[in-house]
Amino acid sequence: MSISKDDILNAVAEMSVMDVVELITMMEEKFGVSAAAAVAVAAGPAEAAEEKTEFDVILKGIGGNKVAVIKAVRGATGLGLKEAKDLVESAPAALKEGVSKDDAEALKKALEEAGAEVEVK
């Protein structure tokens, strides 16, 4: 007769906490593993995911010099005059999405020099 996984799980569920800790210690010794190592490995990727690598550049407002902002948008995005004008007039609007931090900061600087209000997310 073979013991199923459900039978083992039910038996562990009926044990006290101290008995479960003792069982884990015995399993670690028998199989040469450590339960703490699995926790440390699982925590590693979460820290790496926190570092943001892609940014969105959002045009929040056009300021006083609309023509200069349109020119800056055209230069940065490669849009035609009408498309750039429509984009600028529809502010707040996303200009570029998923760009690197350096590209986002350069675009923000160029647009702010033209008089636009820009946000990098």
UniProtKB/Swiss-Prot annotation:
Example GO molecular function: structural constituent of ribosome
Function: Forms part of the ribosomal stalk which helps the ribosome interact with GTP-bound translation factors. Is thus essential for accurate translation.
Protein's name according to its UniProt entry: Large ribosomal subunit protein bL12
Signal peptide coordinates: none
GO biological process: translation
Gene Ontology cellular component annotations, sorted alphabetically: cytosolic large ribosomal subunit
Family: Belongs to the bacterial ribosomal protein bL12 family.
Record text on subunit structure and interactions: Homodimer. Part of the ribosomal stalk of the 50S ribosomal subunit. Forms a multimeric L10(L12)X complex, where L10 forms an elongated spine to which 2 to 4 L12 dimers bind in a sequential fashion. Binds GTP-bound translation factors.
Disulfide bonds: none
Pfam families: Ribosomal_L12 (PF00542), Ribosomal_L12_N (PF16320)
HAMAP family per UniProt: Ribosomal_bL12 (MF_00368)
Keywords linked to the UniProt accession: Ribonucleoprotein, Ribosomal protein
